A protein has these predicted regions:
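Long, highly charged low-complexity segments enriched in Glu/Asp and Lys/Arg with interspersed Ser/Thr
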Residues: 168-177
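S-adenosyl-L-methionine-dependent methyltransferase catalytic core, i.e., the SAM/SAH-binding region
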Residues: 162-164
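Extended two-metal-dependent nuclease catalytic cores across DNA- and RNA-processing enzymes
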Residues: 1-153
Length: 177
């Protein structure tokens, strides 16, 4: 059967991040979700499956580089800057995806952008970062998935089969390799 657990200690996202961080170095992990917050978990071994029938996408480091011009480790910084309407998080005024990508390319991460805001060439962006620094730091704390919560099950306790069909066979059957 399928393992089930409940908690009031953390969100499910934290457990998913915990599994990705704990097991992603040594095994392939595929997170099936439309929640873009999981993009920050992507590594060479951890990918995000966004199932949409014929438009199914497996999000990898290359996908993030192509789509956003950032590394997966910068995704929480990116969303902190641009905001996330689905989570009611307001980013910095005048900072859209292209500007956020450019700032991250130049400064590396959100904290460096804030600390070096005076070096931002465009005055309206510089002023927005300075004015919104506290909110941007709060955004980061809300968006960043740490994955440090105790996990309810080990991977050995989580195998799933149904009528002799393994999870991998099901995924291959829908075109996920």
């Amino acid at each position: 059967g399928i393992k089930h657990t409940e908690t009031t200690v953390c969100e499910t996202d934290d457990w998913i991040a915990g599994y990705a961080h704990t097991y992603g170095d040594n095994t392939e992990v595929i997170v099936a979700s439309f929640d873009s917050d999981f993009f920050q978990l992507i590594t060479e071994n951890v990918s995000i499956l966004r199932y949409r029938g014929d438009n199914t996408v497996i999000c990898t480091p290359a996908y993030l580089r192509e789509k956003f011009g950032i590394e997966p480790s910068q995704y929480a910084d990116f969303k902190s800057l641009t905001g996330d309407s689905s989570d009611n998080i307001k980013g910095a005024d005048k900072v859209g995806p292209k500007t956020a990508s450019s700032l991250l390319s130049e400064f590396g991460n959100l904290e460096n952008i804030i600390l070096n805001a005076e070096a931002i060439k465009k005055p309206s962006i510089r002023e927005s970062i300075i004015r919104n620094a506290d909110r941007l730091r709060t955004n980061y704390k809300l968006i960043k998935l740490e994955g440090t919560v105790p996990l309810p099950f080990t991977m050995k306790e989580l195998p799933y089969t149904y009528d002799g069909i393994t999870t991998n066979e099901v995924l291959k059957g829908i075109g996920v390799k």
